[in-house]
Amino acid sequence: MQTLKVELGERSYPIHIGEGLLDQPELLTPHIVGRQVAIVSNTTVAPLYLERLTQTLAGYNVLPIVLPDGEAFKNWETLQTIFDGLLTARHDRRTTVIALGGGVIGDMAGFAAACYQRGVNFIQIPTTLLSQVDSSVGGKTGINHPLGKNMVGAFYQPSVVLIDTASLNTLPERELSAGLAEVIKYGLICDEPFLTWLEEHVDALRGLDQAALTVAIERSCAAKALVVGADERESGVRATLNLGHTFGHAIETHMGYGVWLHGEAVAAGTVMALEMSSRLGWISTQERDRGIRLFQRAGLPVVPPQDMTQDNFLEHMAIDKKVIDGRLRLVLLRRMGEAVITDEYPKEVLQATLVADYRALVDQLRG
């Protein structure tokens, strides 16, 4: 087992990474403040791991709250289901809410914990690669709004993140690839040697090699923890973690939540960010193509939806948390391994990026 730490003063917390951690109560019980525990999961994950976790928490008053699975349910109505469960069971301010699932469950359970009786204890047990390397670390919680993704939420840190890498053995291939999009992101924005490592090990990662997965998770979480410790509320450097997300969120919103997985939209969105960085002369076309090839090898889409127009993108991108005073800030690559957030770019470069023929670009790479 490896343990990292998110340094936030009195609110610092550990990230435990290893195989079989779900069965080790000593990693959880020090972070549970009362006798009441609510485990929030979904209809896919609960049959696999809910009973095991309940056994690990023997002696506690455990309340299971099982939600429907999918991004389409990351909304106010489903959030109310969590509150209904907590109130009906008379959970008090010393309850602990545990998120057992992927990013959707973590975001909603965390938001519920932030709101319930103005804040109760919260623990993250992420079961997908995407949630293990990204959404479980850093305290971002929330739900989607019909007009924009993650537009309603709060910063609310967990007291511990428990990453059992064995849970990836039950993860569908498509979900695994979606998680790799966020892993690749770290190499692009802050760790080019990691990008090289990923190029050498992407096949092992897709083959569920435990050693390779552990390295990828550790390096991703270490990068995320460092950034969050420096900028918890995304007033500066933390925004660079959103490489590809402005374009990607537009894709998710336009297509309908859940049609494209978040990681799939991030991959296509990052290709657009690479294209724009190349058009600005910040990275070469060869470096752009290097990123595209890695996403392809990870089994991810690299072409935005063909029916999305420039106006579609601009409409959705106008409703983005990085918009300040009406100006859209974008995360782009100054060079491979170094990201910046900026609103200083020629409008025509953004327009050219939105109308670029990505299908032809990918076909050219195949040739």
From Swiss-Prot:
E.C. number(s) listed in UniProt: 4.2.3.4
Q: Extract the Pfam families matched here.
A: DHQ_synthase, DHQS_C
How is this protein annotated for GO cellular component? cytoplasm
Alphabetically sorted, this entry's keywords are:
Amino-acid biosynthesis, Aromatic amino acid biosynthesis, Cobalt, Cytoplasm, Lyase, Metal-binding, NAD, Nucleotide-binding, Zinc
Q: Where does NAD(+) bind?
A: 69-74, 103-107, 127-128, 140, 149
Per UniProt, the cofactor note for this protein states:
Binds 1 divalent metal cation per subunit. Can use either Co(2+) or Zn(2+).
InterPro entries noted in UniProt: Dehydroquinate_synthase, DHQ_synth_AroB, DHQ_synth_fam, DHQS/DOIS_N, DHQS_C
Query: Which cofactors does it use?
Result: Co(2+); Zn(2+); NAD(+)
Q: What is its main location?
A: cytoplasm
Subcellular location(s) of the protein: Cytoplasm
**What pathway does the UniProt record associate with this protein?**
Metabolic intermediate biosynthesis; chorismate biosynthesis; chorismate from D-erythrose 4-phosphate and phosphoenolpyruvate: step 2/7
Write down the superkingdom of origin: Bacteria
Molecular function (GO) terms for this protein are: 3-dehydroquinate synthase activity; metal ion binding; nucleotide binding
One GO BP on record is:
chorismate biosynthetic process
Q: Which residues does the annotation say bind Zn(2+)?
A: 182, 245, 262
| Functional summary from the UniProt entry | Catalyzes the conversion of 3-deoxy-D-arabino-heptulosonate 7-phosphate (DAHP) to dehydroquinate (DHQ).
The family classification in the record reads: Belongs to the sugar phosphate cyclases superfamily. Dehydroquinate synthase family.
Kindly give the PANTHER family that the UniProt entry links to this protein. Answer: 3-DEHYDROQUINATE SYNTHASE (PTHR43622), 3-DEHYDROQUINATE SYNTHASE, CHLOROPLASTIC (PTHR43622:SF7)
Name of the protein this chain belongs to = 3-dehydroquinate synthase
Annotated organism of origin: Pseudomonas syringae pv. syringae (strain B728a)
User: Quick one: which gene encodes this?
Assistant: aroB
